[in-house]
Amino acid sequence: DNSLDFSLPSMVPIELDLDIGMGESNIDFTDLILSRIQIEGGMGEMNVEMHKPNPMVCDFLKIDTGLGSFEAEGLGNINAREVDIEVGMGSADIDYRGHFNHDVEINIEVGMGSIELILPENVNVKAKVHHNFLSSIDMDDLIKKGNYYLTDDWVSDRPTVYLDISVGLGSVDINLR
């Protein structure tokens, strides 16, 4: 049984680059000050959580899953301006609810895998989806207007989540809760 437990300082901004090949990872970012994060998972199971708002804006959050599974709770609390999510042949269940008061751009690329993304109900959403007839897209909580999917109750003074989604043979499920 190989395991590693460690803590990071909670009083200084941290830039993280995590590359985890195989195995199970449980990562709790709560109480950290995060300025930039890159997470790469190979064939393992990764669980990430953030239960309190990041006290600073995180410039960039990148999540790259290979064949493994990725689950996250409270990622909106990371307070990122730009998010890149790449899902190869694995799966990602991402709860992006949390506290953020600015617009965020989320770019999602799915190959043969699947992603379920939960966004907070109290934000505007504008999504552009690039897919083909082999892709599965579920955007039931959004309405299609022209080339975009939008929140039905758009309010100009609340944050907007801009989604740019590309799907190959995989599936994408976007929900508002």
Regions found by a protein language model. Give the residues of each.
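Membrane-embedded segments
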Residues: 1-13, 17-26
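Right-handed parallel beta-helix
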Residues: 17-56
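Short, surface-exposed interaction patches in beta-rich subdomains
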Residues: 1, 48-177
